[in-house]
Curated annotation (Swiss-Prot):
Cofactor remark: Binds 1 FAD per subunit.
GO molecular function list: 4-hydroxybenzoate 3-monooxygenase (NADPH) activity; 4-hydroxybenzoate 3-monooxygenase activity; FAD binding
EC number: 1.14.13.2
Gene symbol of the encoding locus: pobA
Chain positions recorded as FAD binding sites: E35, R45, I46, R47, A48, G49, I50, Q105, D288, L301, N302
Subunit structure: Homodimer.
Gene Ontology biological process: benzoate catabolic process via hydroxylation
Superkingdom: Bacteria
Name of the protein in its database record: p-hydroxybenzoate hydroxylase
Function: Catalyzes the incorporation of an atom of dioxygen into p-hydroxybenzoate (p-OHB) to form 3,4-dihydroxybenzoate (3,4DOHB). The reaction occurs in two parts: reduction of the flavin adenine dinucleotide (FAD) in the enzyme by reduced nicotinamide adenine dinucleotide phosphate (NADPH) in response to binding p-hydroxybenzoate to the enzyme and oxidation of reduced FAD with oxygen to form a hydroperoxide, which then oxygenates p-hydroxybenzoate.
Length: 404
């Protein structure tokens, strides 16, 4: 067995692990990334596409925002379609100029992987039998890669390996508490190389169920419709999908909708999930390893980024100043923001979807609530503040700015 030593072992090379690695690299902190999947698989995963303002700022501080600046699509508002009428929520006007940016998680991942490769940083892909050990005292990571067995001795382990990863599963059950809500429907999503139906996202509340008109670029669109959990992708031809989407849109949007062959089609179940705490001795959980949100609020990737903002700040503070304050506060600070994002994502999901179990009274109440929100500046402000992203509880991210 080959033994290595480093300061931080990062398990998982999704956006959370890669972003943490990039920020640690900028601060001169040694680290290694261990990933079970291949680099090609990681780079090709199709995920979220909306970045909060604070996530964009964090990628800039990490020095990986060149493509984001060139190809990202800033959006200052969203549209909500209900009862056949569209209402625009002016995000920027309601949040002192803040906005969101359309830039796919796939592109964020590729940018971070390219920066890592150019810097010649150590990553192990296609790692087998990844295990973490003794993370309350002397952390170690063991795995096999290309026929060689490795042991990494480190100061800390960052568990960025997703919902099904080994890190959370390695925590003793009496040390961890989980909270979960599974929703009784999924999203059937289609990716197509057609221009978007509108310049901004359209969220649809309809009698036939939720729909979302989104995009990845000016020439690639992403559309979703609510379907039962029992449904299967094989049940939907492209023509059937487009027809059902039109049934949920207003006449103007139907007229503008450009259809075409799908290049990806899948059904994603919706769930809310939170782990408490997010730190176990010298093991930190971040991103999907610690929490899942339904995609309605566009918070999954952004929560991973905020976790990494707190974690990188804490580690930089520890290695540059010898302070453990950030480490000790990591879980508490993250969870404050996580639960607010969970609330917003749950609220958006509940407000815009049809539940089979809801009564006509429940349905009328939801319509009244949405009508109130859209007709009230205060209501729209609440939605907008959460949508563009709540601020980080870090003093201007001073440590990260210094690291960059």
């Amino acid at each position: 067995m080959q033994t290595m030593k480093t300061k931080v072992a990062i398990i998982g090379s999704g956006p959370a692990g890669l972003l943490l690695g990039q920020l640690l690299y900028k601060a001169g902190i040694e680290h290694v990334i261990v990933e079970q999947r291949s680099a090609d698989y990681v780079a090709s995963r199709i995920r979220a596409g909306i970045l909060e303002q604070v996530s964009v700022d964090l990628l800039e501080q990490a020095g990986v925002d060149q493509n984001l600046k060139e190809k990202g699509l800033p959006h200052s508002g969203i549209e909500i379609l209900t009862n056949g009428q569209k209402f625009r929520v002016d995000l920027s006007a309601l949040t002192q100029g803040k906005q969101v940016t359309v830039y796919g998680q796939t592109e964020v991942t590729k940018d971070l992987m390219q920066a890592r490769e150019q810097a010649g940083l150590c990553s192990f892909y296609e790692s087998n039998d990844v295990q973490i050990h003794d993370f309350y005292n002397a952390p170690k990571v063991t795995f096999e890669s290309n026929g060689t067995h490795y042991q990494i001795e480190c100061d800390f382990i960052a568990g960025c390996d997703g919902y099904h990863g080994v890190c959370r599963a390695s925590v003793p059950q009496d040390k961890i508490k989980t909270f979960e809500k599974v929703y009784p429907f999924g999203w059937l999503g289609v990716l197509a190389d057609v221009p978007p139906v509108a310049d901004e996202l359209i969220y649809v509340q309809s009698e036939r169920g939720f729909a979302l008109c989104s995009m990845r670029s000016e020439t690639r669109s992403r559309y979703y419709i609510q379907v039962p959990l029992t449904d299967h992708v094989e049940n939907w031809s492209d023509d059937q999908f487009w027809e059902e989407l039109k049934n949920r849109l207003d006449p103007e949007s139907c007229e503008k909708l450009v259809t075409g062959p799908s290049i990806e089609k899948s059904i994603a179940p919706l769930r809310s999930f939170v782990t408490e705490p997010m730190r176990f001795g010298k093991l930190f959980l971040a991103g999907d390893a610690a929490h899942i949100v339904p995609p309605t609020g566009a918070k999954g990737l952004n929560l991973a980024a905020s976790d990494i903002a707190y974690l990188s700040s804490a580690l930089i503070e520890f290695y540059t100043q010898g302070s453990e304050q950030g480490i000790d506060q990591y879980s508490e600070k993250c969870l404050q923001r996580v639960w607010k994002a969970e609330r917003f994502s749950w609220w958006m999901t509940h407000l815009l979807h049809r539940f089979e179990t809801e009564s006509e009274f429940d349905h009328k109440i939801k319509q009244a609530e949405l009508s109130y929100i859209l007709g009230s500046t205060a209501g729209q402000t609440t939605l907008a503040e959460n949508y563009v992203g709540l601020p980080y509880e870090i003093k201007s991210l001073d440590y990260l700015k210094h690291a960059s």
